[in-house]
Amino acid sequence: MTKDNYDVASFMEQALVEARAAAERGEVPVGAVLVRDGEVVAKAGNRTLELHDPSAHAELLVIRQACAAAKSQRLPDCDLYVTLEPCTLCATAISFARIRRVYFAADDAKGGAVTNGVRFFDQPTCHHEPEVYSGMCEVEAGELLRSFFAARR
C-alpha cells in the first residue's frame, strides 16, 4: 500500500498488462500506468518501433497523455508505476513533470538511471526528486524482459 492506501500491486499489474501488450507488438516489454487520487489517468506500453520514435517509452507516453488531459506540463499529484527502472530520458521527464512518486518493478543495471547509472534524481541539476519505490512485481517483470530478449537471440 502507498501512503494514500492505494493498491500498489493492482497498479503494477496494470503496468504489466501494458508491458505484455508491448511484447506482443514486438516492442521491448515495458509498461507504465499514471495514477491520480487512486484512479488511472493514463497507461501505455513502449511504442518506439510502431511510432518510429526513440522517445516513445511507456513512461513518456503516459506523461504526455496525462499532461494533455490536465492541460498542464506538471503532474505533482500523480504517481507513476512502471515495470522497468526508468532511463535517463524518462527520469528527466518525470522530474520536469514533477511526478510525486515513482514505483518500478525491475532494476535496469544497463540502462536505468534511478538506482543505477547516473542516478538522475540524486544529481544537483535535478529539478524535482520524486519518492522512489522499487521491487514490486520485480520477478514477473524481469522474467518478461528476459524471455522477450531470449526469443530474439
Q: Language-model features: where?
A:
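A cytosolic small-molecule/anion-sensing beta-strand core signal
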Residues: 36-37, 64, 76
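Immediate flanking context of iron-sulfur cluster ligation sites
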Residues: 72-84
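Short, basic and Ser/Thr-rich N-terminal targeting/leader segments
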Residues: 26-30, 74-76
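A short, polar/charged loop-to-alpha-helix boundary motif
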Residues: 50-60
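Short beta-strand scaffold segments in enzyme catalytic cores
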Residues: 30-38
